[in-house]
Amino acid sequence: MIEITNYRQGAILNHNHGEETEKSLKVRIEGISDHGCPVMVNGMSAEMDGRRFSADIDLTEKINTVTASTITPYGNYSQELTLVWDKKSFKRYNFYIDDHIFTFTDLAKERPARAFDHFYLKGLKEIHEKYGTVFSLNCFYHNDHHEFLLKDMPDIWKSEFTDNSDWLKLSFHAYSEFPDRPYAEASAEEIGKDWDLVQNEIYRFAGEAAYIPPCVTHWVNIHPSAAQEMIRRGTRCYAGPLRLRVMGGPSLADRQKGGNMTEIQARSISGADRTAETLGLNLHYGFDEENNYCNNHRSYYDPLLKLYFYYNGVCCNLLPVKEIPGRVESILSVADKYNAETFGIVSHEQYTFPYYPNYLPDHMERMDLAARLYTEAGCKPVFFNDGVLGNTIWDK
């Protein structure tokens, strides 16, 4: 057996991992050859140290194949990995906000002269003007709290949305807030129908320039058929695994009627809302290797799906203001150790609205703070669905 040990399948590598020039990224490949026989890495002889081997190779493409092979008296063995060169990488962050329908409901009812006079859009624009933050607003078609359909959103502010589309994008999220996990058992046709409803309305009232494919669906969990349809429609990255899993957060009852947000946030911060109580349950429900890797490295690439998977780490509606600096500092510290440069912020629209049962008066302040902290850490705002998680150098 032979195994490359210092990089995972789909590892995203940047200038911090080796020596970068205009033409290549030179990185060291390390591993173990059980029989201690000579190893070749991409056709070059590796240095041997007992069973251990190492070799310096050049990554010259965005997507690179690395093959380690050995010939032994017992047969021939090889391993192939896909590594991504994040060329001219830079620290960056993506910010998406889920569950948008209240803003459109208000706009249709109030009809202000300018859409960005509405307190919510005005607040986001102020964050953008201070830090350059760009937002993806993931949208519902139906409002489950106050009867409204996205088809009833006026198009009188279309030029305004188009004019701001360089920093504010709208995307599909789900038909409506309820039920939970709407695409866990959905077919391609079912998610496609809902997707078309939302996307067509975005085109109508905001313009095609304001649209971006989603990097997450409602409750994240998604059926394989729905996932394939999502990828076919242009999704290039996803915030966490596609498969069904325990999510945590407010219960259905808490979200419908209101709950104790202090208690909900405390359970989220501690992890008690999603952690298995015993080792046996954790081994059954958990994917520790993937979780540990993403918590450290923040992202990886799946070459079969041609999809980038990444972790956020900061969900503003679940982190009180006093907890956000510590969370961001922890994420940045670990990322520096593992040479990671991609970060994510997420939140949910409804917590900004006084008439929502779980209203958080400081929700906009939380989002402002998260954006400011990543900006002060030298991170640039990007849309992860573009290029290599927001780095578009390979597209130029």
Identify the meaning behind each predicted range:
Residues 1-22:
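Short, compositionally biased P/S/T/A/G/V-rich stretches that sit at domain boundaries
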Residues 27-33:
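Aromatic/hydrophobic beta-strand junction motif of beta-rich domains
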Residues 56-63, 73:
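Surface-exposed, short loops/turns at beta-strand junctions within beta-sandwich domains
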Residues 80-161, 211:
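Active-site beta->alpha N-cap acidic-glycine motif
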Residues 134-223, 245-250, 341-344, 349-353:
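Metal-dependent polysaccharide deacetylase catalytic core of the NodB/CE4 family, i.e.
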Residues 147-149, 209, 221-342:
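Active-site-adjacent pocket scaffolds in enzyme catalytic domains
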Residues 238-242, 342-396:
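C-terminal domain-boundary segment and adjacent tail
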